[in-house]
Amino acid sequence: FYCFAQPVAQGANAYLAAQGSALRAADITGVTGQGLLQYLRGGDPVIVWITKDLSAPRTGGCTWLLADTGETYVPYVNLHCVVLAGWDGDTCTIADPLQGRRRVDAAAFLQCFRQMGSRAVVVH
């Protein structure tokens, strides 16, 4: 199972408010590569949805029946969520919960990010 940006931002905001923090999370789905770079320059890492190996998104294997809409959903089988932590020319630094901090090709990252719907959350 997984979720995308909106419920992550909502959950983060509930937690931040409960902690008395002035920080807030925002669903910035649709942000451009330039927009991501602006958040990073401002010191704000960004949670992004990509694939495990920056390959094209794949679906299949099963279907989900969404209880609230009755729709059938075919889930991604290689979906992954990481924190975009830096950008230096042709490479991006991501904090990957499976592989730790690593550098990836910026063009491949952006292509995958766009293919996954440019989904992102920033906390600032």
What positions do the PLM features span?
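Cysteine-nucleophile protease catalytic domains, especially the papain-like/related folds used
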Residues: 1-45, 117-124
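Structural recognition of the beta-strand scaffold that forms the well-ordered cores
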Residues: 25, 46-49, 83, 93-95
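Noncatalytic regulatory segments and standalone regulatory/sensor domains
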Residues: 41, 54-81, 85-124
